Amino acid sequence: MKAQGFVHKYGDNVDTDVIIPARYLNTADHKELANHCMEDIDKDFVAKVKEGDIMVGGWNFGCGSSREHAPIAIKASGISCIIAKSFARIFYRNAINIGLAIIESEEVAQSLENGDEVAIDFDKGIITNCKNNQQFSTTPFPPFIQEIINANGYLNWISKQKANA
């Protein structure tokens, strides 16, 4: 599994209320959620983001209310992976459950800047900053996590398991 895109970088303690404000929680429409992703801290995010781009955060990314809407909004906006110094645990689980790749690495999150082009090889745990060819090593996802992400989420993965049983 691989991803490549441009960096959209944010700071520490980006909470779920900022990722998708509560005023939009009355919809389950993924495109509608994507249209409002990050609007309270980056009003141009939706216009800037392209399919495959990478979001980078600081410490405690995804803190706050436990809402699956937050990783759904990020994924539906076109983001292929989030790299952060650390994640709120419930956000981490919700992201994996909906098939959004996330990588926890202080070194990588610190080194990448807005606009850097990044290539990620999830199978090998290699992240490359294409701007300066700097490479970083991370721990690859365990096989079952890769399967969940490849299946586009936990529910799809379960359906595949049932179909193959």
Swiss-Prot record:
CDD domains to which the protein is assigned, alphabetical: IPMI_Swivel
Involved pathway(s): Amino-acid biosynthesis; L-leucine biosynthesis; L-leucine from 3-methyl-2-oxobutanoate: step 2/4
Keywords tagged on the record: Amino-acid biosynthesis, Branched-chain amino acid biosynthesis, Leucine biosynthesis, Lyase
Any one GO molecular function term: 3-isopropylmalate dehydratase activity
Keyword hit for Amino-acid biosynthesis: yes
GO biological process, one term: L-leucine biosynthetic process
Stored InterPro entries: Aconitase/3IPM_dehydase_swvl (IPR015928), AconitaseA/IPMdHydase_ssu_swvl (IPR000573), IPMI_Swivel (IPR033940), LeuD (IPR050075), LeuD/DmdB_bac (IPR011824), LeuD_type2/HacB/DmdB (IPR011827)
UniProt superkingdom: Bacteria
EC code(s) of this entry: 4.2.1.33
Top enzyme category: lyase
Catalytic activity: (2R,3S)-3-isopropylmalate = (2S)-2-isopropylmalate
Summary of subunit composition and partner proteins: Heterodimer of LeuC and LeuD.
Biological function: Catalyzes the isomerization between 2-isopropylmalate and 3-isopropylmalate, via the formation of 2-isopropylmaleate.
Family per similarity comment: Belongs to the LeuD family. LeuD type 2 subfamily.
Official protein name in the record: 3-isopropylmalate dehydratase small subunit
Protein species of origin: Helicobacter hepaticus (strain ATCC 51449 / 3B1)
Gene coding for it: leuD
